[in-house]
Amino acid sequence: MAMPRKSVAIIAAMPRELAPLLRGVPGQLADSVEFFELENAVVAVGGIGRIAAWSAAEAAVKRYQPSTLISAGIAGALTASLKVGDVVRGSEVVDADSGARFTASGGESVMVTVSSVSGPEDKRLLADRYKADVVDMECAVVGAVAREHGIAFLAVKAISDEFDFEMPPMAGFVNGNGKFETARFAAYIAVRPKWWSTLRQLAANSRKASMNLSHALEHLIYEYANTTQEEKIPRA
C-alpha cells in the first residue's frame, strides 16, 4: 500500500544504529520491514545482510516513492586514519560478491559490501583488493535498488570498529531473516570471558557511531528534502 510520499528513504539494518534519530518515533511493521516516519524522511529497517537490505529498500520505494535512497549504518574501517565515530560518505560502493560498482552522491570514499563481518586480516585484503576505506554488509544492495529505480543514492556510514579491531564471532548468529539472535549469542559469550572486554568496547564504540551518524543524517534529510531531483545527480 502506498503511503504519503517521503522524498528521502534511509535504509538501515537495525534500529539501534540510528537510535538518537529514532528516539520517540514509533515503528510500523509491514512486509517484515519496520518503518519509522520522520517529518521529511522515512527510515526502513529490514535486518542484517543483503536479502534484508534489498527487502527494506524495495519496500521503501514501493510505499513512499522517495527520490533519494540513503544506505546508513555502522561499519568497519579499512584504513588506519579512520577512527571510531567518524562519519564517512561514499563516492563509490563495490559489491565484493559480484564486482558491481555503484556511484554515490556527495562522498569521497570507496566502500565495499561483504557477506560476513571482517576481522583485521580480512580488512587488509579488502583494502588492498578494492582500495576501499570502509566495509559493510548492505550498502551495495541499496545502491542496486536505487539504480534499478533511477533515483539518487547516498552511502553514509559511521565507524564502530577500527582497522585493527578484532570483532567477536557474531556472523553465525544472524538468522535467515537478517535478525541478530541476541539470546543465543549471549549464551555463547557467557562461557567465553575472553570476549567480554571486546564486547564492552564494541558497545561503547557503536553508541558513539550511532550518535554521530544520527546527527549527520539530520543534516542530510534537511538538505535532500529541500533539493530538486535534478540537483541530486550523480545517481546510482
Question: Which ranges hold each PLM region?
Answer:
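Extreme N-terminal starter segment of soluble prokaryotic enzymes
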Residues: 4-9
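Short hydrophobic segments within beta-strands
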Residues: 11-13, 44
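Helix N-cap/beta->alpha junction signal
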Residues: 14-15, 139
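Short N-terminal binding/cap micro-motifs at the start of the first secondary-structure element
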Residues: 17-21, 52
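Glycine-rich phosphate- or other oxyanion-binding loops that anchor nucleotides, phosphorylated ligands
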Residues: 31-236
